[in-house]
Regions:
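Short, intrinsically disordered low-complexity segments
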Residues: 22-66
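A short amphipathic beta-strand at an alpha->beta junction
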Residues: 72-80
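Short, extreme N-terminal segment that most often corresponds to the first beta-strand
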Residues: 1-21
């Protein structure tokens, strides 16, 4: 069963997510199974943990949270 999160934060105008996206671990596990998925939205980052590889998904989730905290004093993580 997937675990879905919305990482809400106020991104600065002109925010470019390229650096965080380029630092993410591969979302594909051996056997071509998806470990996690994400999308960059106006209100923050949407993240889906496929429950395939908790270590890799956790690393990716942490990178998104750290990126939000670099640019905003308040970050809200919703478990959807």
């Amino acid at each position: 069963m997937d675990r879905k999160y919305m990482i809400r934060w106020d991104a600065p105008e002109g925010f470019d997510p390229t650096s965080v996206l380029m630092s993410l671990p591969s979302p594909i596990a051996p056997g071509v199974r998806e470990i996690y998925n994400y999308s960059v939205k106006e209100e923050g980052f949407y993240f889906v943990d496929r429950q395939v590889d908790p270590r890799t998904a956790g690393e990716a989730l942490k990178l998104f949270i750290d990126e939000a905290l670099k640019h905003s004093n308040e970050v809200i993580i919703e478990n959807l």
